Amino acid sequence: MAVLLPVAGGKGGVGKSIVSLNLAVTLAHQCRNTILCDLDLGGANLHTLLGLKNNQAGLGTYITKQETDFSNLLQATGIPSLQFIAGDCHYPGVANMDFFTKKKIIKNIQSLDADYVIMDLGAGSTYNIIDFFLTTYDGIIVVSPDLTSILNAYSFLKSAVFRFCYRQFAPKSPERQILQNSILQRMEGKEYSFDQILSVIASKFPESAEKAISEMKKLHPRIIMNMGRGHTDIELGNRLLNLTRNKLSIEAEYVGFVPYDENVTLSIARRQPLSIMKPDSPLCLAMPEIASRLEATVSGKDIFLEDVQENLEEIVNSYYDKLNKKDRNQYD
């Protein structure tokens, strides 16, 4: 069964699709059979970044039932070990698919024959985007080192945790009503952590609350800091970890630091992945370590660090150590 890697961004402009694309190429270069799936249905553009024409069947074709065999959506990219499923933005309204269509797409994605399926999601926090993000316990969220990105990522994770928790209880149940009431109280200026909300549910419905708490503990979002400028980003980046721990009662983890890379603009203009066009660029140097960290998580190795600041600081230091070593080798 393929490992699913849903990649979300709390807001547009954080470079989510660039990260998804180059991570997919990196995994393919490591001989991992990889499928890149464009699930940004309102603004699909990965075909452009790959240098492919948008003239083949995609998810829009499937949603509108013009193609009924999901496997026919797979197309070659010209890159060994990498296949692609287009979002197909020719059909208006496909981003607002019904629940059963979404469920069918998720089931088909889970059945794909590959080592990894990277799911590039749309920006924002609609239920469709969140449900694709929650196809795994440890989805990836891409942030940039600015306050609006950090706060939007927190808002996205808050919506995802609420959606995840809500789905643990039966429809029209009193437990769901307590969760809904917590949203109303938040609108009135009273905000509670998920620990506090679940404690209220546990006091009345201990059995169902225990199951929900057990599932909540499995949530482990992974974060990639993109367009970083250096060590000054660490303090800002750790705000997101502290917010998720204190307010959402979940443990998130940084798995990558991707520096700002001026070559990205040129790679977009040339319609060629940067990992192909200029594999020694700053962004591309960061990708193998991200792939290794993700693979270590999948293989069951415990790479989580309890000290949240050490987590991001270690990743930033590791990147610049690698960069300095590369620079030294050029002059040896």
Task: List where the protein language model places each region.
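P-loop/Walker-type NTP enzyme "switch/lid" segment
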Residues: 37-115, 171-173, 178, 182-192, ...
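Conserved nucleotide-binding/hydrolysis micro-motifs of P-loop NTPases
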Residues: 41-43, 89-92, 124-125, 146-149, ...
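Glycine-rich phosphate-binding loop used to anchor ATP phosphates in small-molecule kinases
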Residues: 110-128
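Nucleotide-binding motor/catalytic cores of P-loop/tubulin-like NTPases across gene-expression machines
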Residues: 248, 254, 259-270
